[in-house]
Amino acid sequence: MITIYKNQLNEIALTNDIFRRDINLLYRFRFYYPTRKITKEGNFKTIEYFYKWTKFTINETLNEFLLLGDIDLLQSNSQWEFTVEYFDVGLNQWLDAYSDLVTIN
């Protein structure tokens, strides 16, 4: 079980210059983990584990102790993809802002 704080997202944002100045811009993040499972036929089947998107705005990140949520990633010593996206109103779609592999111990 890990806890993600909004100040951690701010730290990533400052380091990687992903958040824009528009404080009302909507962002979302999630963890994603693809794994492979052996089927009866001996073939590999890809099983995808991911956690639902958690949405937030920059306004909400001003309180560093405001929790985004507790996330149970189930598997220790595994690498998950941590992704942040922002919503572009003009294009009416979510666009990538940041992605990185996170090792969970």
What are these regions (language model features)?
Residues K55-S76:
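Signal that preferentially marks extracellular ectodomain short beta-strand elements
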Residues D88-N105:
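Short beta-strand elements
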Residues F29-F31, F56-I58, F82-V84, V102-I104:
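Hydrophobic beta-strand residues in large extracellular and virion-surface proteins
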Residues R36-K40, N63-F65, G90-Q93:
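Short, surface-exposed beta-strand/loop "edge" segments at domain boundaries and coil↔beta transitions
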